[in-house]
Amino acid sequence: MTHEEIKGKRCAIIGGKRSGIAAAKLLSRAGAYVFLSEKSVPENQATLESDLRAHGIECEFGQHSEEVFDADFAIISPGVPSSAPVIKQLERAQVPVYSEIELASWFCKAKIIAITGTDGKTTVTTLTKKIFEADGNENGYHAYALGNIGQPFSDTVESLSENDVAVIEISSFQLEHCTSFRPNVTVITNITPDHLDRYDGNIQKYAAAKYRIYQNQTASDWLIYNDDNEILHQHFTDPERRASLPMKLVALSLEKNLGDEYEHCAYKENGRLVLKLTNEKEWLIEENQISTKQFRGQHNIYNALTAAAAASALGIDKKFIEKSILSFEGVEHRLEFVRAVNQVDYINDSKATTVNALWYALDTVTPKIVLIAGGRDKGNDYTKVFSFVKEKVRAVVAIGESQEKVVQAFGNLTKVMKAFSLDEAVRLASQEAEAGDTVLLSPACASFDMFSNFETRGKLFKEAVMNL
């Protein structure tokens, strides 16, 4: 949709959190008549209403009234599921529904790198932005990390020039209502079971939402995917599908030398990372150089290689890629070293909301480990980590709604204790740990049973550790 098409249109915004508010203000500036509808009643309702109305936006809280369904089109916030009654009613009323990412893309002049996947999105987004920032400082443009990483695309899009780069982290929820969104570079880090409660327990439905990220790409665009991930490997090696995709495909692997197999690839050879996006190999750093306390482990080698491939696809010089990777200190709440107490390391991996993320944490951290796990379960199957738990974990402290499931999963493998607060969990873990051990918060679950988000869970864990 163009600016001219938006002007004078009636738009309903479903959801009044940060993305919804950013979308509402963007549309109002573009000349649309905007009505924001939020089912919950926020504590700061009066302040929020005043701010919205100052921007020419009408709003309601505590309901979705009939006015919503009189719109010419609607924008859905990422926290509102497609199965919500209000969305179903909009569809029955034949009101087009778009995501906030889709909306912002209508206004975007900058090059777009879009990153999705189950795990690794935020780290890849942050590192990719850092690489482009290094290049931009020397070549006169700006790079931005936007989207699901915390800064709505709609907040920033109007300030982006055609020379700038928008690195956008995108969830499956945000992709469900994208129709014309077209990134110059698309990245899919991996697909493992997650959010299956939103997809009828069907991982193929979840994967299909992720694949929407590349649906509008053309021959001039790039798609980077993890070929070591079984679901992605099967999807992109299907001969008929591969032949039908117009964009340049970049297969990425740490398990296989892909140099002779694919025209475009990124892989490891003789311990070094290699990019092959042209006819020539480009040798990067050795994998063992990615080994600081804050940025280490196999998963971060994948993340580094992925960010390198994304930057290389848009022509970034190797010196900026290597410099950025070597100086990268990781991202908060992702295997974040907090402190050592009595020769015990404490690591905050609150962002580990899947079993796959827990697997990488247990693979990375040296034994023995006292693990704090649990929260809101997302259909977890813990069998994948049984061998690690048996070999490396001294004890597990189970927390949250899934406490009993965690006890049942690991009770025959190691000692398991229950805690009913994060403070108690840290205290029990500290009592159980011995010199040389690591206390690891890696919940493998969502945080919403006990906390507002994983960031709050991580911050409270760090506070508890600092109080020991």
Swiss-Prot record:
One of its GO terms (biological process) is regulation of cell shape. ATP binds at residues 117-123. Gene3D superfamilies: Mur ligase, C-terminal domain, Mur-like, catalytic domain, NAD(P)-binding Rossmann-like Domain. Pfam families: Mur_ligase_C (PF02875), Mur_ligase_M (PF08245). It is found in: Cytoplasm. One of its GO terms (molecular function) is ATP binding. It comes from the Bacteria. GO terms for cellular component: cytoplasm. Pathway: Cell wall biogenesis; peptidoglycan biosynthesis. It catalyses: UDP-N-acetyl-alpha-D-muramoyl-L-alanine + D-glutamate + ATP = UDP-N-acetyl-alpha-D-muramoyl-L-alanyl-D-glutamate + ADP + phosphate + H(+). Its EC number is 6.3.2.9. Its main location: cytoplasm. Keywords: ATP-binding, Cell cycle, Cell division, Cell shape, Cell wall biogenesis/degradation, Cytoplasm, Ligase, Nucleotide-binding, Peptidoglycan synthesis. Belongs to the MurCDEF family. Cell wall formation. Catalyzes the addition of glutamate to the nucleotide precursor UDP-N-acetylmuramoyl-L-alanine (UMA). This is UDP-N-acetylmuramoylalanine--D-glutamate ligase. It comes from Chloroherpeton thalassium (strain ATCC 35110 / GB-78). The gene is murD.
